[in-house]
Curated annotation (Swiss-Prot):
PANTHER family: UVRABC SYSTEM PROTEIN A. A zinc finger (C4-type) spans 260-287, 737-763. This is UvrABC system protein A. One of its GO terms (cellular component) is excinuclease repair complex. GO terms for molecular function: ATP binding; ATP hydrolysis activity; DNA binding; excinuclease ABC activity; zinc ion binding. Keywords: ATP-binding, Cytoplasm, DNA damage, DNA excision, DNA repair, DNA-binding, Excision nuclease, Metal-binding, Nucleotide-binding, Repeat, SOS response, Zinc, Zinc-finger. Belongs to the ABC transporter superfamily. UvrA family. The UvrABC repair system catalyzes the recognition and processing of DNA lesions. UvrA is an ATPase and a DNA-binding protein. A damage recognition complex composed of 2 UvrA and 2 UvrB subunits scans DNA for abnormalities. When the presence of a lesion has been verified by UvrB, the UvrA molecules dissociate. It is found in: Cytoplasm. It comes from the Bacteria. Forms a heterotetramer with UvrB during the search for lesions. It comes from Helicobacter pylori (strain J99 / ATCC 700824).
């Protein structure tokens, strides 16, 4: 009986990793389990750093001795015992790939099956004339020639050389020895027994005359013999010249290979590599399969509205005495151009000469020496200036490849069709449309029985994988979408879909907030997908704050009661029904006892708007929208409706560029913004890491580390030893541990496995050498200080205002639990975003800032959301404007104004379908067909 209990449960005994307080917990297997609790309470520590880490360690133990030699260095989680643990797979929010060749299709392997489908049953078309491509047998060719007009005079030719450079004496001699009398050389018939001289540096075409014959029934066998001889001589190809009286002759091309007889082009047999943009067989030769090319961007080299002599040409000005600046002055003098004019004020001829050169020699002085040089134009000058450094990044832009139009493949591959659609069609359609296409078997009725048999298993695999993507709410994405551009939440749901497709059973899946980035409309679809994964015989542990996900769980574990040192305990474990009867923080929000309510602030007396006009990007077409200033405005809508396109890809870069150039109410790239005079800066607080190395941490990012180093350097012992502030930096030699160079960890290369970070055995993770650690403030070394939580450090430095004020802002945004020296790479996206928000709070406020945040509630418990809402409204109360892209209804219902995009994602989105106060959007939801409004109406009841 005891054995059965262990097998049915995962039993954790004595978990003490990070802030966990000797946890004992039993988790039922093969169920949907949710871990919840405040940010920093220890949920992720228990789920990822304990359960998943131990599962991985046990997996490594099962490997060969070569892999096991590293196990002493790979730390075991601080836990006494875990029983009943099954193989573990973690699906977190990290972006899937940084490789520009990775797409949604390649990650999910759907593209591999599409390549196979196109290679096996694809119909080839000529990319030039769009005619079908076919191959012919020798008997087919003979039959077609014999059926030419009766008594036609024809010449049967064997192509030997096609448009190649060389003298080809050996080829001509070989034809003579084989008994050929005549040949066509560059379109002219010559006798092979005469001397033929070909220029070896020019391209030539040589065709052997196999026979000259008249079309009639008597010559049928002769024609057949000549055709077979020609095909053998030219490896499956031949030409027929039909002679006509009083008219030019007609040429016909025949081939045993796949060919377009109209364009006289041969094509290789299709194989999966023909559709791989990572292979020379399929990749576009211009962009090498990337779909984009980098080229010089004139707008980055030249400011058309700045006088030429005042730095308009960014690539050469700033170096007033430089070689190119002097040459430019000579160019202006020679061409009679007034350098006080702007580029836009020059005529077309002058503009072209300036940009592209005009070949004229320019006289100028450089270092007191007269020089004469041809003016190449500033674009060529830019290339010349940076040829050695090979760094043109500041002056270049990534643009769609004009050869393949961004589709990455060769023209011959892009012209192949399956069911009337090309590969590019499948890669650019929303996944929802691709799913419906493959779900309709009538599209493939045109295939013959053999082709259907080949296609059937491939179509089944494609349909399954596409359905799983559609089922997790990713129907708006495309298979060709660059993997680098998808969010952490999207990336996680892609991997969930891939796992369902893998069909694994008996696995422990650990997921980190899979509902991130999902509209309420799609949350139930995600829950059903997770259920499908669980029903295959797997255990799901989901770290989550979403109400719906928690309510649909089989078992809930609530970690708390607070964050950091005040957390690390299991405050509840059991069913949702029992949870709702509890009286701790999570239960109070779920059963409605406690609610998130907006703070009371006076609304602005003056109403100003920021108006964006003529937005055309992705699925947004010719959109204009007004955004109220000095308010908390939420941009809402289902995934893929155009929120990020409108705000992050249009408003943000356009407003920043115009404000940086002090240009109010002007347009950029066709987009016009009205109302910028009410702002002095636009700040985007994203979820990108605050640093990419172990030496980046909250203390260094917020600037509090500088004040701490000053304080340590002011200690009496430090002054006696002559230690400056740099002694207490782990970024430079002197005070840091040189074995790990101030990282605290050392990277171990695992070769066939991911690299592992292990604690430095010299400094034991302290980052500093022993001499530096001897300097103490109130009995604590600088390493001790970095190991403190923000909350502990705030109490410790209470009498040091310069330090305390910066720490207070971190507490204000709900980050009192993180440690000052926490490695930046271990912080979640939500934590990184709030650290950036804290840094902004510590700066002097102008009251004219537009803050843009993308899903700031990521990783936040209800209590933390309440806290964040107070901070956002406090910034608005100072006169600033807050623009938040958000799905969380607790933030949306407490906003001043909502702009809802939709009605759906992808091609069905891109419009503003509702706007107004939360109450107005909710009341008009039936009329506007706003999903946000419908859920808001339920929330506001």
């Amino acid at each position: 009986m005891q054995h059965k209990t262990i097998m049915d449960k995962i039993i954790i005994q004595g978990a003490r990793e990070n802030n966990l307080k000797n946890i004992f917990l039993e988790i039922p297997k093969n169920q949907f389990v949710v871990f919840t609790g405040l940010s920093g309470s220890g949920k992720s520590t228990l789920a990822f750093d304990t359960l998943y880490a131990e599962g991985q360690r046990r997996y490594l133990e099962s490997l060969s001795s070569y892999a096991r030699q590293f196990l002493d260095k790979v730390g075991k989680p601080n836990v006494d015992k875990i029983e009943g643990l099954t193989p573990a797979i973690a699906i977190d929010q990290k972006t899937t790939s940084k490789n520009p060749r990775s797409t949604v299709g390649t990650i999910t392997e759907i593209y591999d099956y599409l390549r196979l489908l196109f290679a096996r049953v694809g119909e080839q078309f000529c990319p030039t004339c769009l005619e079908p491509i076919s191959s012919m047998s020798a008997s087919d060719i003979i039959s077609q020639i014999c059926h030419l007009e009766e008594n036609s005079k024809i010449i049967i030719l064997a192509p030997i050389i096609k448009d190649k450079k060389g003298s080809f004496n050996d080829k001509l001699e070989s034809l003579r020895l084989k008994g050929y009398v005549r040949a066509f050389v560059d379109g002219v018939m010559v006798r092979l027994d005469e001397e033929i001289h070909l220029h070896k540096t020019k391209k030539h075409t040589i065709e052997a005359v196999v026979d000259r014959v008249v079309i009639n029934s008597e010559n049928a066998s002769r024609i057949a013999s000549a055709v077979e001889k020609a095909l053998k001589e030219s490896y499956g190809e031949l030409e027929v010249e039909i002679l006509q009286d009083n008219a030019p002759s007609i040429r016909k091309h025949y081939s045993e290979h796949k060919a377009c007889f109209k364009c006289k082009m041969s094509f290789e047999e299709l194989e999966p590599l023909s559709f791989s943009f990572n292979s020379p067989k399929g990749a576009c030769e211009s962009c090498l399969g990337l779909g984009t090319k980098f080229s010089l961007d004139i707008s980055k080299i030249l400011d058309p509205n700045t006088p030429l002599n005042q730095g308009a040409i960014k690539v050469i000005f700033g170096y007033n005495r430089s070689y190119y600046a002097q040459m430019f002055e000579g160019f202006c003098t020679y061409n009679g151009i007034d350098s006080a004019l702007c580029f836009n004020e020059l005529n077309k001829e002058q503009q072209d000469a300036l940009l592209y050169g005009n070949g004229t020699e320019i006289s100028f002085h450089f270092k007191n020496s007269p020089l004469k040089r041809p003016w190449k134009g500033i674009i060529q000058i830019a290339y010349d200036m940076f040829k050695e450094q090979k760094d043109l990044s500041d002056y270049m832009s990534e643009k769609t490849c004009s050869s393949c139009n961004g589709h990455r493949l060769k023209a011959s591959s892009l012209s192949v069709q399956v069911a009337g659609l090309k590969m590019a069609d499948f890669l650019t359609k929303p996944i929802e449309e691709v799913y419906h296409f493959f779900n309709d078997p009538t599209h493939f009725n045109y295939l013959n029985e053999q082709e259907k048999k080949i296609a059937e298993p491939i179509l089944k695999e494609i349909l399954e994988r596409v359905f799983f993507l559609y089922d997790v709410g990713l129907g708006y994405l495309t298979l060709g979408r660059d993997a680098r551009t998808i969010s952490g939440g999207e990336s996680q749901r892609i991997r969930i879909a891939s796992q369902i497709g893998s069909g694994l059973t008996g696995v422990l899946y650990v997921l980190d907030e899979p509902s991130i980035g999902l509209h309420e409309k799609d949350t139930l679809k995600l829950i059903n997908t997770l259920r499908n994964l669980q029903k295959k015989g797997n255990t799901l542990i989901v770290v989550e704050h979403d109400k719906e996900t928690i309510k649909h769980a089989d078992f809930v574990v609530d970690i708390g009661p607070k964050a950091g040192r005040h957390g690390g305990e299991v405050v509840f474990s059991g069913s949702v029904k029992d949870l709702l009867q509890n009286n701790h923080s999570t239960a109070l929000y779920l059963n409605g006892t406690k609610k998130i309510e907006r703070p009371k602030f006076e609304p602005p007396k003056e109403k100003h708007f920021l108006e964006i006009k003529n937005v055309n990007i992705n699925n947004i077409k010719n959109l204009s929208v007004q955004i109220p200033l000095k308010q908390l405005v939420c941009i809402t809508g289902v995934s893929g409706s155009g929120k990020s396109s409108l705000i992050l890809q249009t408003l943000l870069p356009t407003a920043q560029t115009l404000l940086n150039h002090a240009k109010k109410n002007q347009s950029l790239n066709g987009v016009e913004i009205v109302g910028l005079e009410y702002l002095d800066k636009v700040i985007y607080l994203d979820q990108a890491p605050i640093g990419k190395t172990p030496r980046s941490n909250p203390a260094t990012y917020t600037g509090v580390m500088d004040e701490i180093r000053i304080l340590f350097a002011e200690q009496k012992e430090a002054k006696i030893l002559g230690y400056s502030t740099s002694r207490f930096s782990f970024n430079v030699k002197g005070g840091r541990c040189e074995k790990c160079q101030g990282d605290g960890d050392i990277k171990i290369e695992m070769h066939f496995l991911p690299d592992v970070l292990v604690q430095c055995d010299s400094c034991k993770g302290a980052k500093y050498n022993p001499q530096t650690l001897e300097i103490k403030v109130k009995g604590k070394s600088i390493a001790d200080v970095l190991n403190m939580s923000v909350e502990e450090a705030y109490e410790f430095f209470a009498k040091f205002p310069k330090i305390a004020v910066k720490l207070k802002t971190l507490i204000d945004v709900g980050l009192g639990y993180i440690t000052l020296g926490q490695n930046a790479t271990t912080l979640s996206g939500g934590e990184a975003q709030r650290i950036k928000l804290a840094k902004e709070l510590s700066k002097k406020d102008t009251g004219k800032t537009l803050y843009i945040l993308d899903e700031p509630t990521t990783g936040l418990h209800f209590e933390d959301v309440n806290h964040l809402l107070q901070v956002l409204h406090s910034l608005v109360a100072l006169g600033n404007s807050m623009l938040v892209i958000e799905h969380n209804l607790d933030i949306i219902k407490n906003a001043d104004y909502i702009i809802d995009m939709g009605p759906d994602g992808g091609d069905k989105g891109g419009k503003v379908i509702a706007s107004g106060t939360p109450l107005e959007v909710a009341q008009n939801c039936e009329k506007t067909q706003s999903y946000t409004g419908k859920f808001l109406a339920l929330e506001l009841k």
